[in-house]
Amino acid sequence: MTASILTALLLLAPITPETARFTIRQDGRTIGTEEFTIRSQGKGYVAEGKTQLVGDPTPLSCRMELDENLNPTSYEYTHGLGTIRIKIETPTSQMTVGGGGSESSTEFRFPSGASIIDNNFFHHYLLLLYRVKGADQKFPIFVPQDMQAGQARVRSTGTRTYDLEVGDVKLEATVDSAGRLTRLTVPAAKVVVER
């Protein structure tokens, strides 16, 4: 079965609701974990994640609501007292950033059709891979913690394997027969994320 046919078949299957845990390693040492849940809500989905990094007593948390096409409609990130909340609408979206008792809001144009790929939340790559419909695709992305838009390129490299380029970062992903992310590596940083 060719990679493009397998990719198409994976897309025809519904998103797999799941609760799972990734272990994050760098240079062979465990540097953190991420627990996440993806569940159906109405016609869309809710994805929630919590990442605990070694040396940081405060976990990072996020919650994303997505429509039936996996387009984000809202996003919330928290780390201690710091928060980022995004309400995605057309033509203008709203971002509210809080921390230390103060809060500021700004309107901005969320890139049309973009995926959210935030720092230290690896289940966001799983959601991106669920959107793949061909052997080589480009997707607009938005990184809330960096407040930057960019582009991700996803290329199928074989049965259930992908190369990803997110800005300057190159990653390799492996999914199982249900399309669930099982391993993500960032070779240049010697980072391996796996179930």
Language-model features: locations:
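Sec-dependent N-terminal signal peptides
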Residues: 2-12
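Acidic, low-complexity segments
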Residues: 56-57, 158-159, 189
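Extended soluble regions of mature proteins
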Residues: 67-74, 165, 172-189
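A short, Trp-centered hydrophobic/proline-enriched beta-strand micro-motif
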Residues: 16-26
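N-terminal helix-cap/turn-to-beta initiation motif at the start of protein domains
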Residues: 12-17, 39, 155-158
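Solvent-exposed helix/loop surface patches that form functional interfaces
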Residues: 76-168, 178, 185
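N-terminal mature ectodomain segment of secretory-pathway/periplasmic proteins
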Residues: 24-98, 179
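Short, small/polar residue-rich loop motifs at catalytic or cofactor-binding pockets
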Residues: 17-18, 59-60, 167-169
